[in-house]
């Protein structure tokens, strides 16, 4: 999992990327391409 400052640009890299908030953190998850995974921090 990558840790990035801004997830907005990462979200546009694949059409199945989802922006999710969990426990006060923002994540990018992708069910079809598992390699697109990131956390904002």
Swiss-Prot record:
SUPFAM superfamilies membership: Ribosomal protein L36
Keywords: Ribonucleoprotein, Ribosomal protein
GO molecular function, one term: structural constituent of ribosome
GO biological process, one term: translation
Pfam family, one: Ribosomal_L36
Cellular component terms per the entry's GO annotation: ribonucleoprotein complex; ribosome
Presence of keyword Ribonucleoprotein: yes
PANTHER family to which the protein is assigned, alphabetical: 50S RIBOSOMAL PROTEIN L36 2, LARGE RIBOSOMAL SUBUNIT PROTEIN BL36B
Family of this protein: Belongs to the bacterial ribosomal protein bL36 family.
Protein name: Large ribosomal subunit protein bL36
